[in-house]
Amino acid sequence: MQYVLIIHEVESYPAWKAIFDQAVDIRKSAGEISYQLLRYDNDANNIVHFSARSSLDNARRFFESPELVEIRKKAGVKAPDFIYLQEIERDVL
């Protein structure tokens, strides 16, 4: 499985979340299979978006696209960090 981990600060979580939810169709078409949203325990505006992806190449194209850059601006995202990951092992304890 392939994943993308995005860490970013947002101006306002509720405003960001509304735009995130509106983008569900373009996220799906870019290969997002599932996601988790997390936040720092001491700052609700520091968000971690962890998603399973069908293709890291498609994910890179999507996250670097002018359309998504504009969406991030509207959502109040500040300097996102993208980490592209390949699963090497999974287990349940």
Where on the chain are the PLM-derived regions?
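Glycine-rich beta-strand-turn "strand-cap" elements at beta-sheet edges
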Residues: Q2, A30-V48, E70-L93
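Short, well-ordered beta-strand segments in beta-rich or mixed alpha/beta enzyme
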Residues: Q2-E9, Q36-S65
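A general marker of short, structured functional hotspots
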Residues: V4, E9, W16, G31, ...
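Short amphipathic alpha-helical segments
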Residues: S12-Y35, E67-E70
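Compositionally biased, low-structure terminal segments
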Residues: D21, F63-E64, I83
